[in-house]
Amino acid sequence: NDFKFEVTDVQKKLGDLFVHYGKVINGSIKLKDNVELKINVKRRDDTRAYHSATHLLHESLRRVLGDHVTQKGSLVEPSRLRFDFSHMKPIQNEEIDKIESFVNQIVSKKSEVKTRLMTPDEAVENGALALFGEKYGDEVRVLSMGDEDGKYFSTELCGGTHVKNTGDIGKFKIISQSSIAAGVRRIEALRD
């Protein structure tokens, strides 16, 4: 039949099991039916770019506002990103300009995006940021972006999909910032 299922989210569960969430667009399916997977390349590429931009935004926030900035949540879609982080006061226009400038400087360098597998201890020794309280296995994936005189601009633990080089992100623009809870700010951003 002409069964079509649109995947809207993928989450890793119980070790190496990946669960695909979505909705049936057309047709029907029964247990043990064979299906053909077709990736929506544009959606994947746009999501990769926004996800990579989120990592550059996080490091830029830390450099402009201070090391107290930690990720509190995020949303990455093919058309935008939203990033929630710890910070006690509104971000000034000059600070927003600096944050955007940091991201766009790394984008313009078209630096290779690198991923490596290592132990959590090795990741921390290499300067990788990790989410506090998360449980990690014996091996973690470390994402590094943006060459700055032989050092990386951003290094974090991440298992997601990313661009091959920072130039694939495109121009980055913050479109809003707001408070969503005491001590938690939200930034929304777009890319060209």
Map each language-model feature to its residues.
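A glycine- and charged-residue-rich anion-binding loop/surface
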Residues: 1-192
